[in-house]
Amino acid sequence: MTVIYPSPIFGPVHSRRLGVSLGINLLPEDGKVCTFDCIYCECGFNSDHRPKKPLPTREEVRAALEARLQDMQKNGPVPDVLTFAGNGEPTAHPHFPEIIEDTLALRDKYFPKAKVSVLSNSTFIHRPAVFEALNKVDNNILKLDTADEAYIRKLDRPAGHYSVRGIIGGMKAFKGNCIIQTMFLKGGFGDKDMDNTSDKYVLPWLEAVKEISPRQVMIYTIDRETPDHDLQKATHEELDRIAALVREAGM
């Protein structure tokens, strides 16, 4: 089954990439709010989970986070990271920049060694306040599943006006202070072949990554239930080949 996360705080969970991660969900607890509608999303399709409840307020997020950090300070476990993730796109919250300020202050107070991470699909990085907030966190993790304009509309299915080239330009503005995260998979969606592990997709993506020049690249494949059941994991060999190309490019 796909999953909808509690709000505004969930976990901690053990993350493959980040360690002991306390989740911060700025979206409603009863549904999904996202500018993407990815066919592999562990939260399901947007249409499956239309929320009826409001977004948590800045004050609710701050109070819930402080209470959880106090409990973890007393009873454990020690978090490696505080991660903005959950039921959709965290930067869509109207008070995302202020919530980042609150989170950094609480992190410094209770667990100064913990990192603050944001998992974002990059659709709001053109907003100056969002850009500045992402520049302040330890791990600014930005999604770039492809450099192909047609393929992204089959895989990530962005809402409204969306330009891959525009997003790549926005990512370049971070001047290396970002981590690129990319999903590689195979299988189909309806009558569409969704395999993005071939050079047709990998090489243009690699050129885009070189342009962005991030400090790190995360490549991964499906690990949890997906709303479309015809999707398949990329193999270890395929991921290793792509990783080798990234390393050869100096990242």
Where are these regions (language model features)?
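Short, charged low-complexity linear segments at domain edges
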Residues: 2-26
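Canonical Radical SAM [4Fe-4S] cluster-binding loop centered on the CxxxCxxC motif
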Residues: 17-63
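Conserved alpha-helical substructure of the radical SAM core
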Residues: 44-81, 95-98
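Amphipathic alpha-helical segments in well-structured domains
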Residues: 58, 100, 202, 235, ...
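Short glycine-rich or small-residue beta-strand-to-loop segments that form or flank ligand, phosphate
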Residues: 82-87
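Conserved AdoMet/S-adenosylmethionine-binding subsite of the radical SAM
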Residues: 92-232
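Short acidic, glycine/proline-enriched helix-loop-strand junctions
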Residues: 228-251
